[in-house]
């Protein structure tokens, strides 16, 4: 099999993850894996979401928990 030669792409430092998918063509990645993808979305993800996210949420979500630690003086309300 002939290997395709590609050049590296430059990713701007200020790009958001939402726009990252715009940098890659639809067939970017392992095309052999596309044959096993039942719905043809090209990334091995089973619901049409992006890059292997199979439950429709964003894999990069933080947990939303704030530990409450700050730089101020200790509370006197106890």
Curated annotation (Swiss-Prot):
This is Putative uncharacterized protein DDB_G0283069. Residues 31-64 have a biased composition (Acidic residues). Residues 20-78 are annotated as: Disordered. It comes from Dictyostelium discoideum. The lineage of its organism: Eukaryota, Amoebozoa, Evosea, Eumycetozoa, Dictyostelia. It comes from the Eukaryota.
């Amino acid at each position: 099999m002939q290997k395709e030669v590609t050049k590296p792409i430059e990713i701007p430092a200020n790009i958001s993850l939402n726009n990252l998918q715009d940098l890659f063509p639809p067939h970017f990645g392992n095309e052999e894996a596309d044959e096993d993808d039942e719905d043809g979305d090209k990334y091995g993800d089973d619901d049409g979401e992006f890059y292997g996210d199979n439950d429709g949420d964003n894999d990069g979500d933080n947990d939303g928990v704030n530990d409450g630690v700050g730089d101020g003086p200790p509370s006197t309300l106890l």
